[in-house]
Amino acid sequence: MKRNKIFTLILIVVSMAMGFSSCIGNDDDYNNNQKPTIDPVTYSYKDIYLQTSMTAYPFFSQVNSSVEKNKNFMISPLGMTEVLTMLVHGANENTAAQINKVMNTPWILPAHIMDAMKSLNDFLPKADSKTALAIANSQWIDEGYDVKNDYIKNNIDKLDAETLTQLLSTETTKDDINSWCARKTNGLIKDFLKSPLQQNTRMVLLNALYFKGQWKYKFDKK
């Protein structure tokens, strides 16, 4: 990845600012560069969920190693998968291969991963009437930055990503992103960004998850 990138992870919101060559310029599609060793159609949605869920352990370990000792933290492997799903179908060649490796889906086409995530996002919020779950995605594009329409449309159609175009490195955008995070997390995350994004930021992908449920085994309050 030759372009400058920003990767920030805080609690259950995942943000990535990036510039990838496949999102701009020619219409070369990542799918044309993929050469799965087995027919990707044989992968069921369940297979894809299992593959991506296996990233939770190394993800937790990586975050845990960077967190202050004895300090509580929370991560969302699902949130990471949502963002990487938006990301991978806009990447080519080595970049796409690296993202697929992180997702543990090296032989699965991005289009099939997106279909699986769409199905999961449709199902999970309605899976349990006693549990509240909201999943939100958004893509923020720097004003004047040329992003392929197909890429934008796929994120909208498959992952219901809100799409906003504005100058990203401004105080206004920082406030807008923080407001978005606050709305989508029911006010639990209000100050995701402490300062404006860097001037070389061209695109931001965001995922937010809000969950409220009852513990099957409650903690001792003491």
Language-model features: locations:
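Bacterial N-terminal signal peptides that target proteins for export
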Residues: M1-I10
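C-terminal motif of bacterial Sec signal peptides marking the signal peptidase cleavage site
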Residues: M18-S22
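Bacterial signal peptide processing site
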Residues: I24-D27
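Post-signal peptide N-terminal segment of mature Sec-exported envelope proteins
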Residues: N33-L50
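Mature N-terminal segment immediately following signal peptide/propeptide cleavage
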Residues: S53-N64
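Active-site-surrounding "flap" and adjacent substrate/cofactor-binding loops of secreted or lumenal enzymes
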Residues: H89-F123
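Non-catalytic, conformational "gating/processing" segments within enzyme and secreted inhibitor domains
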Residues: P110, A116-K222
